[in-house]
Amino acid sequence: MKKQIGDRYEPKDVENKWISLWEKKKSFAPNSNARESFSIVIPPPNVTGSLHIGHALNHTIQDILVRIERKKGKSTLWLPGMDHAGIATQMVVERELAKESKKRTDFTREEFIHKVWEWKNHSGGMITKQQKLLGESVDWSRERFTLDEGLSKAVFKVFKSLYDEGLIYRGERIINWCPASQTAISDLEVEFRETKGKLYHIKYPIHGKKDQFLVVATTRPETMLGDVAVCANPEDERYTSLKDVVLDLPLTNRQIPLLFDSFVDKEFGSGLVKITPAHDANDFEAGQRLGLKPLLVMNPNGTMNENAGIYQGLDRFEARKKVLADLEAKGLIEKIEDHIHAVGHNSRGGAVIEPYLSTQWFVKIKPLADLAVQAVQSGQVEFIPKMWEKTFFEWMNNIRDWCISRQLWWGHRIPAYHCKKCKHFEVSETAVTVCTSCGSQEVEPDPDVLDTWFSSQLWPFSTLGWPDQTEDLKRYYPTSVLVTGFDIIFFWVSRMIMMGMKFMQAPPFHKVLIHGLVRDKDGKKFSKSVGNVIDPLVMMDKYGTDSFRFFLAATLPEGKDILFDESRLDGYRSFCNKIWNSSRFILMNLEESFVPIGITPDIEKDLEPMDQWILSRFNHCLEEYNKAHSKFHFYEMAAAIYEFIWGDFCDWYIELVKPRAYGKVSPRSAEVAKQVLSDVLIRALGLLHPFMPFLTEEVHSVFSDQYIVTTPFPESYPVASDSLGVQKLNLLQEIVTKIRVMRSENGVAPDKKCKVIVKSSDNLSSSTILENEVSLLQLARLESIRIDTLYEIQKTDSVSHFTKGEIVLPLEGLIDVAKEKARLEKELQKSELEKEKLEIKLSNPGFLSKAAPEVVEKERDKLKTLIDKVEVLKKGIQNLAG
């Protein structure tokens, strides 16, 4: 072995080296010769985006899965790409133009779109570079963009097909309207903020009845101008006698009826609601049931229109003030209450969203939703954790038609064409320039573009070449698993299942792995306004990418949120250094002539008990790792490999084997030890690689010219877990651990050598202690250890039971008993006080109901640790008391 690694682990140097080498060697391209396939498509990030903590978690999980399957010899395709992000990208470019005092409308549509493409090619896609920094093993040669020619072809084919079936239509419905951007936006782009507002109780005069009113409460009095009825519950006895009553709509010359519908909650407020079908989704549905004609009182820019009478031209919020002043002047406000309610805002600009009646393009979604429900019910698609299936079904059963048109310029233009001459209308997959009815060239395309989600719902098969029947499509569809957050189950996951079932007659993936969010250590969502946002690139630079990736996986409980605790990152950086230093120790003790041949039959016959033990411990680690992998329990996988490398391998085996590695025993024993050291390290690196790709590749490169990314997945060793050698080493480990605990509990200084007596008549204990006396003295920091079944235990002795007898640690002369007892009593008092505070906190209903579940769980873990600590301290005091 001529190669060596550096004195210190320098993450940035190692990361830059391997990012370049992997790409140069095309290490992540699928193996076309493999019989089995494994594929994942990355949820396409926005072209405007940068890597945030959610991306880092999501992509790390996917990379772990992909790297494992690649090492298992499968043809692995992890397909990257970006979403054109219609409104987000258009807003970015418009902001750039504003710096030059220009507006979008200063350009033709074609000129503006050209500018967006220029921005995309020059400044967009920053996230791609950041994904490489995270170590993502995607096949970059297959990167896709939702506006690519092939993907656009798929979009137009799907639109035409759904339109021809009557599943896409143009109609008038309530949508989320942004007056600032003057476009419809998706539900996902509406951010609901808790807002301190007012609840206005307005008197509606009964027509023809002097001084008789019905009181209706509203938070949006300006929309009252568009009321077409007031509604009560048909079972509300307060109003059943008023069935034929007509009301004077305040501030207008109109009369509106009092009607009855069961959707009204008779327990809320006065039990009456205003019906404004053009400005409220529930009112629109009620209006359709009751045969009411909507009345729109607002312009697209948020000003009041001609139907608002004297308020025409006023901004909606100015109109609110004027309406309230006029109502007050007429004595038509009964009362005003403070009211906290959720107000929808455009997440990309902050403007208050209006529920707005508009003519748009819609997908008749129920028939498609039924296909998705059937796919999940039949087991073709499995949600992990399973609890998310219930959420999925609830959403699907209450789904409404989907507004797919956006009043933007950037995006897939709706493939519908209108002839100005003969009024002929048609939908076509290809551009129409000549009317197919009259031959006129006066054909206008629809001005709107499609919702970004329309193209991204086709992502699993459009990226593989559909509608063409490509080899990629045949081999990699359906994909193996989708990894995503719960927040887009409705917006993206469900729609992908619908489209897969509709156009591929198969779901787009077999499993949907739902992970939680990353929150701050107090359980709060990361938010720029709160100021608690964590930049993953900063963390990667500070602690190393491998430490950061391992943290994300190791702290990810199934289906729950991660609480971001930066101190854990420091611990995993230490883990990286531990691996590096241990690897360096092994390499330094390998001669230039050493060749790692593994555990061959020739080596196997000369294995010593400590060798058999570490091989069995690796087998146990591998079993736990594989079991956790089958359940997507990444934290258990991380725990298994962490405990094996740090505990079994570094802290135990390397310490035990040092005399042999140093050549202080027979040459054959040294040779076997070095083969075991190197082979166990190589296999452990193979398990760790999906979590820590950079460090493992660097260390592995010393042993082999083949990159670890494509070496076979580690296998178990042919060693029995209950062999005599393994039993002896398990017993040795137990004895050393017990002695270490006794030393700690009794305050014995680390540099003080102790004398220990073992009371046991068991032959295994005797042979283990005699054969490993040197190791025992070294590992437990002992002056001596002897077996004495007749030893009489003294008052000042500390005693601990192990599986084969008792371990006695005489404390006389070793510590100042009175001083140590006082220290333990002080520590006990402090711990009991902390324990009491935590118990009070965890019995407080307010804390339990308001705190995030992860925070509550963290506090419970703290309490459990304190309870254990209190017991240990009491035991220590009891020992010292004799």
UniProtKB/Swiss-Prot annotation:
Reaction equation(s) it catalyzes: tRNA(Val) + L-valine + ATP = L-valyl-tRNA(Val) + AMP + diphosphate
UniProt motif 'KMSKS' region: location: 525-529
Pfam families: Anticodon_1, tRNA-synt_1, Val_tRNA-synt_C
Subcellular location: Cytoplasm
Record's keyword terms, sorted: Aminoacyl-tRNA synthetase, ATP-binding, Coiled coil, Cytoplasm, Ligase, Nucleotide-binding, Protein biosynthesis
Predominant place of localization: cytoplasm
Domain of life the protein comes from: Bacteria
One GO MF term attached to the UniProt entry: valine-tRNA ligase activity
InterPro entries, per database record: aa-tRNA-synth_I_CS, aa-tRNA-synth_Ia, Anticodon_Ia_Val, M/V/L/I-tRNA-synth_anticd-bd, Rossmann-like_a/b/a_fold, tRNA-bd_arm, tRNAsynth_Ia_anticodon-bd, Val-tRNA_synth_C_sf
Coiled coil: 812-881
Assigned EC number: 6.1.1.9
GO cellular component: cytosol
Residue ranges annotated as motif 'HIGH' region: 45-55
Domain remark text: ValRS has two distinct active sites: one for aminoacylation and one for editing. The misactivated threonine is translocated from the active site to the editing site.
Function: Catalyzes the attachment of valine to tRNA(Val). As ValRS can inadvertently accommodate and process structurally similar amino acids such as threonine, to avoid such errors, it has a 'posttransfer' editing activity that hydrolyzes mischarged Thr-tRNA(Val) in a tRNA-dependent manner.
UniProt record similarity statement: Belongs to the class-I aminoacyl-tRNA synthetase family. ValS type 1 subfamily.
Entry protein name: Valine--tRNA ligase
Annotated organism of origin: Leptospira interrogans serogroup Icterohaemorrhagiae serovar copenhageni (strain Fiocruz L1-130)
Gene expressing this chain: valS
